[in-house]
């Protein structure tokens, strides 16, 4: 199991293949991605690499983290993330990870934070159909309706689908295919859409459920 990388979502575009089919692509940029530290089975109970991306002002880093970056002999990073790895896949601290960590035709899993939608109603948040448009219904056309039973149990159960904050959730999209890798511009072109807004950070790692590589 190899390490993943931290990338930045640039936006979307599309291309046409040899059959004239239009393929939607999401562009992600890999820049300044370095190994910050190691987690070992003997010391921490598991094997992992700590990856960092995007340089940060030293004045904005806490003293404990300053020592971490000083030990790694690299500049402070804005984003840090751990990736579990197998024992034979350790990479030297301060080593850089580039776009050629992946190849065209490979399948990857993307973990990102969805776009925040604020407080949303039940129809938008959970795809409820709403109440009737007429036949005695007034004001509450977009209401979720009843949320419980009667005096017993006398409460709304946890997890009940209701209106509330929507978005800003960490989600993983599995088995997305890499269309192409542009080493010169440090871009990875991934087929399909990826959660998150432009310039947001996401993690890219080898697909767990789809090992085969088809070009």
From Swiss-Prot:
Q: Which GO terms describe its biological process?
A: translation
* Entry annotated with the keyword rRNA-binding: yes
N5-methylglutamine, modified sites: 151
Q: Which family does it belong to?
A: Belongs to the universal ribosomal protein uL3 family.
Q: Name the domain of life this protein comes from.
A: Bacteria
Known role = One of the primary rRNA binding proteins, it binds directly near the 3'-end of the 23S rRNA, where it nucleates assembly of the 50S subunit.
Put simply, this protein is called Large ribosomal subunit protein uL3
What InterPro entries is this protein classified in?
Ribosomal_uL3, Ribosomal_uL3_bac/org-type, Ribosomal_uL3_CS, Transl_B-barrel_sf
Where are the residues of the annotated region Disordered?
Answer: 136-155
The species this protein belongs to is Rickettsia rickettsii (strain Sheila Smith)
Give the record's GO CC terms: ribonucleoprotein complex; ribosome
Which GO terms of the molecular function aspect are on file?
A: rRNA binding; structural constituent of ribosome
Q: Which UniProt keywords apply?
A: Methylation, Ribonucleoprotein, Ribosomal protein, RNA-binding, rRNA-binding
Can the keyword Transit peptide be found in this entry's annotation?
Answer: no
How does this protein assemble?
Part of the 50S ribosomal subunit. Forms a cluster with proteins L14 and L19.
Q: Which NCBIfam families match?
A: L3_bact
Record's comment on post-translational modification:
Methylated by PrmB.
């Amino acid at each position: 199991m190899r390490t993943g990388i931290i990338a930045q979502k640039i936006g979307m575009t599309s291309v046409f293949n040899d059959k004239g089919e239009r393929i939607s692509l999401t562009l992600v940029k890999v820049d300044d991605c370095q190994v910050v530290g190691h987690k070992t089975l003997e010391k921490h109970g598991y094997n992992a690499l700590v990856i960092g991306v995007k340089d940060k002002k030293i004045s904005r880093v806490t003293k404990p983290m300053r020592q971490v970056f000083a030990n790694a002999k690299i500049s402070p990073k804005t984003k840090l993330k751990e990736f579990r790895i197998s024992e034979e896949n350790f990479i030297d601290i301060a080593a850089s990870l580039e776009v050629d960590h992946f190849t065209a035709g490979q399948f990857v899993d993307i973990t990102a934070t969805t776009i925040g939608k604020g407080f949303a109603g039940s129809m938008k948040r959970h795809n409820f159909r709403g109440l009737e448009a007429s036949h005695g219904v007034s004001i509450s056309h977009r209401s979720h309706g009843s949320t419980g039973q009667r005096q017993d149990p006398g409460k709304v159960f946890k997890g009940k689908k209701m209106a509330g904050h929507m978005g800003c959730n960490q989600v993983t999209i599995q088995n997305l295919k890499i269309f192409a890798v542009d080493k010169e511009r440090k871009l990875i072109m991934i087929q399909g859409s990826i959660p998150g807004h432009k310039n947001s950070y996401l993690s890219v790692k080898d697909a767990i459920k789809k090992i085969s590589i088809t070009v």
